[in-house]
Amino acid sequence: MLDDTIVAIATALGEGSIGVIRMSGPDAITIGKKVFRPKYNKEWYQKDNYKIIYGHVINPETGEIIDEVLLSIMRGPKSFTAEDVIEISCHGGIIPLRKVLEVILRNGARHAEPGEFSKRSFLNGRLDLAQAESIIDIIRAKTDAGAKIAVNQLGGKLSEKVNGLQHKVLGLLAKIEAIIDFPEDDIPEENLLGISKECNSLIKEIEHLLAYADTGKIYREGLKTVIVGKPNVGKSSLLNALLHEQRAIVTDIPGTTRDVIEEILSIKGVPLKIIDTAGLRETQDLVEKIGVEKSRELLNQADIVLFVLDATTGISDEDRKVIDLIKDKKVLILINKIDITKNKIDSHEIRQLINFSEIIEISAQKEIGLDKLEETIFNMVVEGKITTTDSIFVSNSRHKHALERAMQHLLEASKGLQEYVPADLVSIDLKSSWEILGEITGNSVTEDLIDRIFSDFCIGK
């Protein structure tokens, strides 16, 4: 419903200098007049836009002052939601924020659902769906590069590309519809093949967008990087060295790490969701056993596995058991503790055990070899081909799947044209491709999908 007025706390709860209450809807200014008492400008609600007024939020029933505030007024359609919007900046503690929110709710507003402000911005035509989705990506960005990709999407770069693809598909559809409308005309073979070539050209454009979709997803969600190895091989020391802080407990006692430790770090703008696991071994300790099982589960989800070996002992039976678990993954082999002794591990033997692997000698304690490790991880992600300054990244799984489906229908249409199938069947594939592309920007999308997308947003956004 867009005929009611919504309100929510727009900043994180906790102690702070200020907190913001956001209100949007047809009655925002009317409710503001009830609960806000200006210090000077008594006619603050008049037609002027973009005002900030000093005053107090009060309980209109008792006249009690609730908080000293600044009130910002932004009239629709020149606001984020394209509706009348009021934002109240009050003191940032939990109590004043909640008391201000409660008095607004008692005077006619409804508590906003998660993402409802952004949803209204989309429904009112202020943003398209891809742009609206980028807002949550900006909020959740783990690196400067991830934020840059999201800002580009908010600015409409992806939408512009998708709209262009839709326009071209519509042009092809018009040509096919003309054939359907005039079946008595003999259509030259080269005309049909020409339309097929245009389909193939669009397919190549979509393939180009999809080529870096997995990389885009990594920038958005982080590269799931799991550190594995037998107990006491230096996994926790490696985590601490990469984070440049003592995040994990390090002792000489095997099995110190009994649970999974997860942190986010940035390597040249690439976010790593790095996970230190319990040492993989058979154990009777119940807590450690649970940690080992969780480690095995995480291995199945890993984008990259950092397999740590001990340079002082060579490859043990425990190491071979770990290798059996990771041999089908993308693995970096890290030979640790090279500062203590000469490396006793035969790299040729390792390569026989794991087909794809890069071997890097490190000392987690002395931070030797970490620069090479970081460079290798970065190159594995971007393959030396990508900068995020102006690139159009498909970082959202929903967008990726939509492009794949749209491309599949174009492939079917192209194949049908080459095989001279009836034009109305080709038309079905082209229409499907056009509609699926519209799902990305919201040109053709169901209400259920809209609700599902915005439910993932935070309240107040």
From Swiss-Prot:
Limits of the TrmE-type G domain: 222-382
Entry binding sites for (6S)-5-formyl-5,6,7,8-tetrahydrofolate: R22, E87, R126, K461
Entries under InterPro entries matching the protein: G_TrmE (IPR031168), GTP-bd (IPR006073), GTP-bd_TrmE_N (IPR018948), GTPase_MnmE (IPR004520), MnmE_dom2 (IPR027368), MnmE_helical (IPR025867), P-loop_NTPase (IPR027417), Small_GTP-bd (IPR005225)
Superkingdom assignment: Bacteria
Positions contributing to GTP binding: 232-237, 251-257, 276-279
Binding-site residues for Mg(2+), renumbered to this chain: S236, T257
GO MF: GTP binding; GTPase activity; metal ion binding
Name under which the protein is recorded: tRNA modification GTPase MnmE
Organism: Desulforamulus reducens (strain ATCC BAA-1160 / DSM 100696 / MI-1)
